[in-house]
Amino acid sequence: MEYARLGDSGLKVSKVILGCMGYGSPEWQGWVLNEEESLPLIEHAYNKGIRTWDTADMYSHGKSEEIVGKALKKYNIPRSRVVILTKCYFGVDDQGNFPSPLSTGRQNEGDYLNRVGLSRRHILEAVDASVERLGTYIDVLQIHRLDRETPREEIMRALNDVVESGKARYIGASSMAAWEFQTLQNIAIRNGWHKFISMQNYHNLIAREEEREMIPYCLDSGVSLIPWSPVARGALARPWASRSTLRENTDAGISILVRARESESDKAIIDRVEELADKKGISMAQVAIAWSLSHPSEYPIVGLNTKDRIDEAVASVQVKLTPEEIQYLEEPYVPKAIHPGER
């Protein structure tokens, strides 16, 4: 594994980041692994050099964070050896249930009143809960989405206070318009507060709209990209016609973000990923990850549900695509409308 600095900070992360959304409870989403299945995978990733782990409070309603914390204790992993990222914004069930991420915890009302969004109250309470579940501090606290109802200065002041408290070391953001991200950064600069060092956005071979504004802004301003779903929720990891996997059938995100917008362009790109993978004797996922890694200051977050896939992801760091191969993969791309899930 190779490591690089995250944004303009001194913090170094593994170039492939372990995505922990798939570690939690299958009661939340059918494709998610339970604790017993998840823990050995986290240990294996650590032993293979993936020392940066990304989770969120809403993943399996806190269970994912608990599993990350348990992995540290169970395998006696020194806290100083890993970088832990988590997120806040969405509501987390506090009754021990696992309601669907599409049905609850998205609106600041009812049982989730003041438990959704980025008000000062919710940020501080969410951070306290995450620290308790993880059993340790947070390296990078990310805002999962932008709360457009809360004053932006309130958001940035609260995030600054979290860092100053020591409960988080840095802050990052995820999935918003470039101009919105810039306004938040400008507020931090104007007040001498901590700035975001990372942007977790949706960027892969079949979703490249972030290349228009967000990515150029981030590179110009010293912010690293840590894209979520670099293999398009698995669509780039298997042939076009292969749609019988558990995740394909139980992850609503695939139908919303990928299948509902798929086009002949997507098919052409996926066919070329398969062709190039066969030519190089590697997996399709490795081609997609290598494409992401070919961009400056971009370190993809990859969900990995077997030890073999962890090994593949680690090996993908050594896969170097030529400029001609990159052009061949990108050539069929056709612009897409932004889905609300990306904002």
Swiss-Prot record:
NADP(+) binds at S229, P230, V231, A232, R233, G234, A235, L236, A237, R238, P239. It catalyses: (2S)-versicolorone + NADP(+) = 1'-hydroxyversicolorone + NADPH + H(+); (3S)-versiconol acetate + NADP(+) = (2S,3S)-versiconal hemiacetal acetate + NADPH + H(+); (S)-versiconol + NADP(+) = (2S-3S)-versiconal hemiacetal + NADPH + H(+). GO terms for molecular function: hydroxyversicolorone reductase activity; versiconal hemiacetal acetate reductase activity; versiconal reductase activity. Keywords: NADP, Oxidoreductase. Its EC number is 1.1.1.353. The active site is at Y59. Disruption phenotype: Aflatoxin production is not inhibited, while the enzyme activity catalyzing the reaction from versiconal hemiacetal acetate (VHA), to versiconol acetate (VOAc), which branches from the main pathway, significantly decreases. Gene3D superfamilies: NADP-dependent oxidoreductase domain. InterPro entries: AKR_Detox_Biosynth, NADP_OxRdtase_dom, NADP_OxRdtase_dom_sf. The record marks K87 as: Lowers pKa of active site Tyr. Belongs to the aldo/keto reductase family. Aldo/keto reductase 2 subfamily. This is Versiconal hemiacetal acetate reductase.
